[in-house]
Amino acid sequence: PRGARVLTADIHDEAAVKAALGDERFDVAVDFIAFTEEDVQRDVRLFAGRAAQYIFISSASAYQKPVAALPITESTPLANPYWQYSRDKIACENFLMERYREEGFPVTIVRPSHTYCGGKAVVALHGARGCWQTLARIRAGKPVIIPGDGTSLWTATHADDFAVGFVGLMGNPHALGTAVHITTDEGMTWNQIYAVLASAMGAPLCAAYVASKFLAVCGRAAGYDFEGPLLGDKAANVRFDNTKIKRLVPDFAPRVSMAQG
């Protein structure tokens, strides 16, 4: 973009990042690719005293599975016995909040759920060729796997809606020292989601229902990790209370429905 200066370095090479940053100071620093506690420890070393706000991209999959009560709020316990990815995100959050409490490190934690855009369709699972393999099967009238009986609730947020909430948190002093999820208000079952996909392609939906636990076992044998993404995420009933993000960012009002997106 006009007016932007691009600084390039490998974030995993801390010395190279320090050299690239020089004496720069930032209103906001965001890390979308921090996945372990070691990653955020490095970020604290890099951005403490350099950024007025540090935004960590966590995950709504960190919320308790199975969820004890709906809707999910930011105070819902964080515990996911099925997915190491989620447990690592929880460890990152715990470390960052400790740094906030003890040192005033200006962290904001964002927990996205399933976020999509025009280049990425919403499906429950797919093979090595990605979501397009599933869409090709729908278009060809072939069976596609839907976990369980397809009646579990899911939330998929269009990137345009997510961006409104995310940008509204940047430089927002009320967002410091807190965690917030950014999700749409629309909840749909997987049956409804796949029906939308089939309708968009003008094809009939031929659903093959398979138990999520069975998929996890079979996937493991074939070299796929379905246990975390399914049992620890997409196979669980989820519905989010967006009161907090709407309070922090009054302009946040999701507008893109699944059918539109």
Ranges and model annotations:
Residues T8-V28, F35-R42:
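Conserved Rossmann-fold cofactor-binding substructure of NAD(P)-dependent oxidoreductases
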Residues S59-Q84, E98-E103, K120, H126:
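Active-site "gating" loop of Rossmann-like NAD(P)-dependent oxidoreductase/epimerase domains
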Residues Y85-K89:
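Active-site YXXXK catalytic motif of short-chain dehydrogenase/reductase
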Residues E93-V122:
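Conserved beta-loop-beta element that borders a ligand/cofactor-binding pocket
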Residues H126-T134, P147-M170, G177-T178, Q260:
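Substrate-positioning beta->alpha
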Residues G168-L230, N242, R247, V256:
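Mid/C-terminal beta-alpha module of Rossmann-like enzyme folds, strongest
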Residues A253-G261:
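Amphipathic terminal alpha-helices
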